[in-house]
Amino acid sequence: MASKGTGMSFSRKSYRLTSDAEKSRVTGIVQEKLLSDYLYRIFSPPDRGPAAATSRKPLNFHNLPEHVDQLLQVDSEDNESQGQVEGRLGPSTVVLDHTGGFEGLLLVDDDLLGVIGHSNFGTIRSTTCVYKGKWVYEVLISSQGLMQIGWCTINCRFNQEEGVGDTHNSYAYDGNRVRKWNVTTTNYGKAWAAGDIVSCLIDLDDGTLSFCLNGVSLGTAFENLSRGLGMAYFPAISLSFKESVAFNFGSRPLRYPVAGFRPLQDPPFADLVRAQRLLGCFQAVLSVELDPVEGRLVETESSEWQLQGQPTVLLTLAHIFHHFAPLLRKVYLVEAVLMSFLLGVVEKGTPEQAQSVVHQILDLLWLFMEDYEVQDCLKQLMMSLLRLYRFSPIVPDLGLQIHYLRLTMSILRHEKSRKFLLSNVLFDMLRSVVFFYIKSPLRVEEAGLKELIPTTWWPHRSSRESRDGKEAREETTEERQRRRAYERGCQRLKKRIEVVEELQVQILKLLLDNKDDNGGEASRYIFLTKFRKFLQENASGRGNTPVLCPPEYMVCFLHRLVSALRFYWDEYKASNPRASFSEEAYIPPQIFYNGKVDYFDLQRLGGLLSHLRKTLKDDLASKANIVIDPLELQAATMDDLDEDEEPAPSAAQRPMQALAIGGALPLPRPGWLSSPTLGRANRFLSTAAVSLMTPRRLLSTMEKVKVRSLNVEQRTREDIEGSHWNEGLLLGRPPEEPEQPLTENSLLEVLDGTVMMYNLSVHQQLGKMVGVSDDVNEYAMALRDTEDKLRRCPKRRKDILAELTKSQKVFSEKLDHLSRRLAWVHATVYSQEKMLDIYWLLRVCLRTIEHGDRTGSLFAFMPEFYLSVAINSYSALKNYFGPVHSMEELPGYEETLTRLAAILAKHFADPRIVGTDIRDSLMQALASYVCYPHSLRAVERIPEEQRIAMVRNLLAPYEQRPWAQTNWILVRLWRGCGFGYRYTRLPHLLKTKPEDANLPSLQKPCPSTLLQQHMADLLRQGSDVAPSFLNSVLNQLNWAFSEFIGMIQEIQQAAERLERNFVDSRQLKVCATCFDLSVSLLRVLEMTITLVPEIFLDWSRPTSEMLLRRLAQLLNQVLNRVTAERNLFDRVVTLRLPGLESVDHYPILVAVTGILVRLLVHGPTSETEQATSVLLADPCFQLRSICYLLGQPEPLAPGTTLPAPDRKRFSLQSYTDYISAEELAQVEQMLAHLTAASAQAAAASLPTNEEDLCPICYAHPISAVFQPCGHKSCKACINQHLMNNKDCFFCKATIVSVEDWDKAANTSAMSSAA
């Protein structure tokens, strides 16, 4: 428009407005008298109104500069320029003294006002001290950990153990421990939280020192301070590791100024007065309009002002900004003047009016200020906004947060300002994710939660008790009314929080706008670059604390990002019918291998990226039409090898070759790629060339065109979204993927980053926040116990009644506080909407994994975190959100459960997945999955071939792989079917304090007969499956039980020593683990014998006899060790050492009994006789061990009576709640059978010559000879040996065959030959 050209002529590039000729020409636009009145109205001194028209000199643009200079003259400027003030020593600009020898112990920000602890207890002080007068400074608490804030003298000496307040003449307040410190310590003040502001006040006239928290005085902390010669006090702080604060000595306006106290750094008084007067002039322009027709001034509302390009107004604004622009670069003036003005604009009028005014103000800033000036101004403005938002107290209506967010949104709606802030400020200079965080109040009273939730309530029965199956107590009318009142209060709170959340989502929608591409890249593509770099810093810098975004910010950022992302996804679907809804979202698999998205140094499922590109280059060419240049691949490999040794300069100077369509495109290597932590991050993008062939069509060699994935920092809209010749992010589509796009490619990258963000820290934080709910349950249980004691306490014991009443009051007050805090946590973290966000991410990951799996070997390129997020998000929904909202109510819950079950069942033994950690996670997830009825039924619903494949993997031999979790899965499938195996907790642990009932190991038995049947079928069908599996189980049982016995021998010896000694808790834990493994292996054997008894009892099978003999040998060893009176096992069990709680007679003996009963009682007579003969033939068999099961020390002879025991004996008959009468009858039948059989075997046994015994076991006669070496042993020993080794036991010669050996026949043959 014409006015814009006129306004642009008044550029400040040379700080010269216009020529005199131009001025006289322009002033003729309006009547001279009207112009004079207008200028006097705009540039009136603030202390008096406009002078009478008759007594003033006419004012025009010619003499206006002199008038403005006079207006901006400040009388006290000379006094302020002196710098030194009585009572203060040091530089006028107060900062932290980073030269005091604290290097390495603390990390100080560039502005020397922020500090982060980097040692055990580091201390730092300011550069300025005070010795007289009243002074104050503020500390912005960024983390609520251990810190001591206060004052010290120059003679105080600190170290890693002693900080501010630990020496004489140093004084400190510690809000973490709620104490004050001066050599000694006493209670003082209130607890602080992240986002609070502590004001430190010192009155050296009265010799007192006090503190304020968020403007509220905590009272006098110290009196009678040492004063006089040589006594001057420095602001100082001591911080523990990772704690962080920021100081405000007066460089910015104090948030909570205290009357009579002066900041250590004086405000820029003269500039402040000038800026306020200029702001008044600017406001006058907004509220006064010229009416040239009527020749008068019209007063209007500033909220309705419109920039219409009037030359007189533009000239007036040019004169204002000529003086105003340099002032708006100073942080103090931006916060004190411009920020206050803009907040006032936002608070007045409607949001639309405020938005219009702010938008026009920003237009004026960009019009009348130099670019570097407006950029500095916007930078300071956003940093001030961030501080105001982050360190504002929580008020009942969240009004402060709403105002700051509305102003932030108004600024970001201005396109030019938004793009500048996105490119240079939001992610580069400050943590913009703070704008999406809603802090949790530590002090619910100050947050107004008492008024918002006047009635508190908490569950009167914990989730732990409900899972234990205890009957729910009927809810009384009073409890029901309290619960409903509490829920109404929670809803009121949630609605207020939703207002803030909606503003945050609107801000993110502005940042994700991709239609504002006038004059540069759209905001979304700038955001993508910064967002990826943000993820890189948090993924690659996990050991570098200052760079990491706090996880509580990440949680809120993730939820707002999901809302904005789904909005744009569904908006695109509305205009593109072939696209998909956000409910069907997933990440196409080609993004993982085409190099268009940077995954830094994150692990892939198949291992290192360089290894995958070498081994799978043929598959990339055939399935995705991507060809890897061998020379570039070799260069990338060598570059990986030399990376650690290569100096940074040479890395930065190394040329990066890139070939694009049309020829070579040299791209310089960005400097940040050369840093040690980030050097490996973009190796795929920076050194390897990718060749592209047109998708879905085989091309000749000449048609293959080498292309290069652009670096993340250099990508454009075309690089991401693609064009008619370029698929963008979707380069290299495999044949399994549909041709139509899901959505815009940029949204796919945002979704990928969101999944990565959940994996980085969100899941961990969700688990931490459950602690509030756990605290409520603990205190509720304590309150119930106290009330029960009060009811039972005799009235005559008034002393006990008084103590119980006091405890009841403490618990009730704590529960009131915690229940209100829990309402806040549920509204901000565990609400239904947040649950749906996590559920959506779970489904996204499931679909992504399913699509990636269809690509075959290319599945190995998928980053590990997709599987991790799928596992962890389900765990979060079940364990963190489950107590508040039911998972069963989620849409498509059953289908999702089944799809996750199919993924776990297929990939826990997937050879394409090589990472040990992710394989363990998959195994543990599957083990947990089969413990719960709902998820176990989901496993049973997956296709039959997948179920059979899963069971086949579970039955693979245990050697050469982690087997404990596999065995645990098989045990859970059997639990509830075994002998005496229907317990949830062991009988001897019932009286102890219950553990978390949500643990997988404490779930009620839920066996799967379907999966048991699959196991039986596989063991029957495969000739090699059963022997190899059972051989490995028997080997591991032998190892686990032997290790257990060896360890309890050491524990027993240590316990019997006279001198004081301690048993290592780790040794106790390993010992208990070996015992648990032994029990679980016995249960797997019991399941196998029950389901497929012929494996042991059908001696037509070549390995049955050998397996049965080995089983009998192990069972006898276990029985002998466990059942002997007052033996090693017995003594250790009676010690009841902490850590060995699970070690007891019952679990291991009932497992052995179940195996024996199945062998000796069930089945046809021929099979039981075979099992009996093998059991009795084992030299370790003792009938006494079998008698022990029923509490009988020895079999009774006729006519004798059982002697009176001197102590309680173990007996299965004592566990009637766990063992049925039918099972006990079977044990008695087995004992009778073995008693009779052992008597017959003893009568029929003949003495054996020692020379004829097997030289390996010395238990059985020699019955086999090895060929060709001729050594001999019994068949059982050699068969067992050959299961694992083909070399001779004696001479290590290779055994070709084993032949029967009969001494009598061979002796007669030798005699005949002689």
Curated annotation (Swiss-Prot):
It is found in: Cytoplasm. It comes from the Eukaryota. Residues 460-483 are annotated as: Disordered. Zn(2+) 2 binds at residues 1269, 1271, 1288, 1291. The modification N-acetylalanine is found at residue 2. Residues 462-483 have a biased composition (Basic and acidic residues). Residues 968-974 are annotated as: Interaction with NFKB1. Pathway: Protein modification; protein ubiquitination. GO terms for cellular component: cytoplasm; cytosol; nuclear membrane. Ubiquitinated, leading to its degradation. Deubiquitinated by USP19, thereby stimulating CDKN1B ubiquitin-dependent degradation. InterPro entries: B30.2/SPRY, B30.2/SPRY_sf, ConA-like_dom_sf, RNF123/RSPRY1-like, SPRY_dom, SPRY_RNF123, Znf_RING, Znf_RING/FYVE/PHD. One of its GO terms (biological process) is ubiquitin-dependent protein catabolic process. Transmembrane segments: none annotated. Its main location: cytoplasm. Residues 74-254 form the B30.2/SPRY domain. Keywords: Acetylation, Cytoplasm, Metal-binding, Methylation, Phosphoprotein, Transferase, Ubl conjugation, Ubl conjugation pathway, Zinc, Zinc-finger. GO terms for molecular function: ubiquitin protein ligase activity; zinc ion binding. A zinc finger (RING-type) spans 1254-1292. Its EC number is 2.3.2.27. Catalytic subunit of the KPC complex that acts as E3 ubiquitin-protein ligase. Promotes the ubiquitination and proteasome-mediated degradation of CDKN1B which is the cyclin-dependent kinase inhibitor at the G0-G1 transition of the cell cycle. Also acts as a key regulator of the NF-kappa-B signaling by promoting maturation of the NFKB1 component of NF-kappa-B: acts by catalyzing ubiquitination of the NFKB1 p105 precursor, leading to limited proteasomal degradation of NFKB1 p105 and generation of the active NFKB1 p50 subunit. This is E3 ubiquitin-protein ligase RNF123. It comes from Mus musculus (Mouse).
